[in-house]
């Protein structure tokens, strides 16, 4: 297997812009450069969606692949399968595993467990191969593996509609918690514990959907949250007090959503350890706004990362057609601060991490719409913003070429390096790719 390592000495490929002048004297040294880029995949679409650090000092990546050649030469099924990649502490690939059936299977989140095996989350439309059951369209799909990625068990959670899951975490009491969305109309109101009073008449085509299961896949509880329109959750955390925060987007203006701003809002909910709704908060305006990631701060406040097309409601300082939004919310659900991050162009964010000094690194993609003519391919670059906790930008870096390139997730390792993963489309000079479809990329920033 050939792994291409490229040191980016090509100045045209790396762009670094100082957005705001900052006194750097109190910050730890940062080289502020891309050290290397690796690409993986075959001749079809391959996408990395999430990354975690592993207990042996390496890292693991989950995503989905349609390839049956290249790095996925051993895959003997057409269509999309979940993949799990493991790397050592030198960023060298150790092994790859795929999981799926004959239909559409996607991997979006992962966590390493005390036995050093993995729990994977995504959604599956298959009922053959590794997927033993499917109840409709896509089902939430949980996969449990050993430390080498060998399948131990898998389980589907879903009903007749499209039910997707995006994030999974290990809870402090040793269980698993995952979230996504449920088509409540298709489930005819099913999808929650009987102790909850929500009825199917109160909910619509998509709801925030949360599950808690044990390490053998047995359901402990589940519940859905939202209104009569489309509501989807993308990320979650367990708080220091044992509750859960879920973030996503909501189109609803009724039921669990009390103060909507119109259009799609960033929607944040807090639920207790048994899944009961504690509070909810809408952030946005009359356009499309969505929450993508959440973290708890040492103060007990929460930072919500999202994207916004709005310039009204409680988002009033739009910079471009789409801005990254950073919101600080108290433990009681009160909005403390909302900050637009971006330029006069188009930026979206998918994930963020907090450095030990309190600064943030935010990854997503951007494009300069003003430089694109009708006959040109849209250039979406991987974008990395380095900011203070309040969202004030220190540096902006971008990486990419023509085509749709996106940074989907990132981790900050023990050596101070940032590892960014996502997808890279079309051939970029200086980077060896297998084809013009999306390939997995792993980029190191320091």
Model regions: which residues?
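Sec-dependent N-terminal signal peptides
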Residues: 4-13
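A sequence-level/structural motif corresponding to short, flexible coil/turn segments enriched
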Residues: 16-446
């Amino acid at each position: 297997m050939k792994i291409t390592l490229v040191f980016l000495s090509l100045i045209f490929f790396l762009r670094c812009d100082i957005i705001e002048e900052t006194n750097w004297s109190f910050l730890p040294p940062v080289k502020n450069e891309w050290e290397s880029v690796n690409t993986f995949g075959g001749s079809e679409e391959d996408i990395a969606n999430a990354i975690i650090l592993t207990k042996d000092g390496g890292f693991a990546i989950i995503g989905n692949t349609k390839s049956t050649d290249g790095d996925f030469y051993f895959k003997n099924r057409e269509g999309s399968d979940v993949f799990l990649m493991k790397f050592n502490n030198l960023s060298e690939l150790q092994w790859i595993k795929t999981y799926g059936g004959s239909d559409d299977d996607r991997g979006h989140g992962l966590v390493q467990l005390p036995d050093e095996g993995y729990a994977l989350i995504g959604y599956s439309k298959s009922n053959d191969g590794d997927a033993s059951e499917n109840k409709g369209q896509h089902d939430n799909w949980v996969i449990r593996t050993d430390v080498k990625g060998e399948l131990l068990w898998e389980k589907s959670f879903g009903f007749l509609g499209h039910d997707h899951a995006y994030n999974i975490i290990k809870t402090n009491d040793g269980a698993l918690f995952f979230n996504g969305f449920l088509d409540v109309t298709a489930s005819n109101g099913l999808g929650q514990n009987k102790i909850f009073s929500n009825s199917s008449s109160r909910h619509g085509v998509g709801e925030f959907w949360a599950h808690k299961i044990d390490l053998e896949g047995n359901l402990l509880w589940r519940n859905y949250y939202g209104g009569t329109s489309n509501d989807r959750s993308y990320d979650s955390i367990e708080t220091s007090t044992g509750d859960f925060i879920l973030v996503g987007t909501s189109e609803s203006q009724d039921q669990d959503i009390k103060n909507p701003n119109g259009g799609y809002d960033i929607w944040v909910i807090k639920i207790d350890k048994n899944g009961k709704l504690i509070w909810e908060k809408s952030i946005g305006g009359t356009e499309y706004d969505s929450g993508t990631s959440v973290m708890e701060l040492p103060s007990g406040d929460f930072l919500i990362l999202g994207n916004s097309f709005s310039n009204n409601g409680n988002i009033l300082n739009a910079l471009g057609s789409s801005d990254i939004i950073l919101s600080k919310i108290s433990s009681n659900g009160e909005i403390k601060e909302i900050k637009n991050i971006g330029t006069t162009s188009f930026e979206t964010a998918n994930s963020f991490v907090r450095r030990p000094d309190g600064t943030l690194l935010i990854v997503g993609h951007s494009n300069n719409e003003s430089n694109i003519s009708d006959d040109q391919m849209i250039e979406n670059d991987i974008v990395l913003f380095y900011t203070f906790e309040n969202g004030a930008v220190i540096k902006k870096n971008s990486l990419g070429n023509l085509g749709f390139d996106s940074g989907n997730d990132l981790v900050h390792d023990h050596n101070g390096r940032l590892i960014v993963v996502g997808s890279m489309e079309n051939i970029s000079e200086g980077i060896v790719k297998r084809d013009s479809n999306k390939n997995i990329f792993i980029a190191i920033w320091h």
